[in-house]
Amino acid sequence: MELQLVREYGARPWDGVVVPLGEGDLEGYQGPWEKELAAVRASGRFAGKAGEIYRFSALTEGGLTQIFLLGLGKNWDLERVLDDCAKVYRQCQELRLGAVCTDLRGLEPQFTPALFQKAAEAAALTGYRFDKYKTVPTPAGIRTAAFLCEESERYEAALAEAEVSARATCIAVSYTHLTLPTN
């Protein structure tokens, strides 16, 4: 899986867009889906509570895009961000969305590089598959996970650390699969 930082949505059609929002920060998002988010907010279906995921579809120039609102709650910690991001990226994978963009603009500057690293790790680990002994390999899911942020240079080192950490985790898990006795 390719991880990248982007400063704008650009011409690329995204199959899925993840919009993480803190509880009570639903007004902070400014982007192409402001009207849809306002309607969801008015309906009371999404409050931004930790682990809450709300999905809707939006018609864009590139076709139908799946929009995921991800609730981060009031207090963001590393493990919660890792777990909650992993949940939403697994949903993207199950829907076989090839290109997913996570829009962090509503969270900056509170979203620290350490929190960003956990979000990027979650995306990278979602792509892990151990298919060595399967007759039919698991179909590929997310090929590109991008993170949209205004201060991309702030997160460059964290992105590199996330890639290394995720790769090391995948190697360790693969090694475990190869060395454990089968019953």
State where each predicted segment sits:
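Short amphipathic alpha-helical segment within the helicase RecA-like ATPase core
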Residues: M1-L178
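A short, hydrophobic C-terminal helix/tail in secreted or cell-surface proteins
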Residues: T179-N183
